[in-house]
């Protein structure tokens, strides 16, 4: 599976501290006039601000949610009608077995092809089955192998992800990284007796995604020898994100004494 490159780091949010309100009639500085990507961090632009700067990282993964299995049925006869009859008989058995298992028509695709081979006719049919439950997939494949003869060939399953899975995983990694950074900042403020305020800057500094494990390169050279679990592991996608956040820091509010 070819994954698209992740976008570059970008600033998600930058809020001006409350102390800067009321400056509408004052000229802005050269640093403030720069684009967001070139402006210094809030702590540098506002040296008097009370802030905490933290980073957060996260890595998430998702197993494939689809599997494609192809069942091929073929027959070669001197008469075309006999070749068709032989293939269609087994084809009907396969489709009926799938219907009994509750498969919807949109998850099953059937194609047929007949051609001349010297002085005979060769009929071939393919049944492409999309599975969402891998346990049911194994049971059905084992059942068809037991019930049908050697002229029926069942391909190994091909595991894949539905469209949009990689982008959804990238977003999830970023959100978890932000949550981890927020928890870190919260613990720091609790430790020093302060109150964590609103975020002033949220920036994703690094994001990446990949398929399979980094140590699976040897297994990928022999795809025909992989077990089902190894194939699922090899098709699993991963995403990592690293964020930088600046939070406002507030002092602990003192409780008023009631007379």
Swiss-Prot record:
Gene Ontology CC terms: cytoplasm; nucleus
Post-translational modification: Phosphorylation at Ser-55, Ser-61 and/or Ser-63 is required for full activity. Phosphorylated on at least one of Ser-234, Thr-236, Ser-241 and Thr-246 upon TNF-alpha activation, which favors nuclear translocation.
Residues that bear Phosphothreonine: 236, 246
Location(s) in or outside the cell: Cytoplasm; Nucleus
Primary localization: cytoplasm
A GO BP entry: positive regulation of canonical NF-kappaB signal transduction
Keyword annotations of the record: Cytoplasm, Nucleus, Phosphoprotein, Transcription, Transcription regulation
Chain spans, region Required for nuclear localization (NLS): 239-259
Pfam families hit by this protein: SIMPL (PF04402)
Subunit structure: Interacts with IRAK1 and RELA. Interacts with HSPA8 and HSPA1. May interact with Listeria monocytogenes actA.
Domain text: The disordered region interacts with HSPA1 and HSPA8.
Protein name, per record: Interleukin-1 receptor-associated kinase 1-binding protein 1
Species: Mus musculus (Mouse)
Lineage: Eukaryota, Metazoa, Chordata, Craniata, Vertebrata
Gene: Irak1bp1
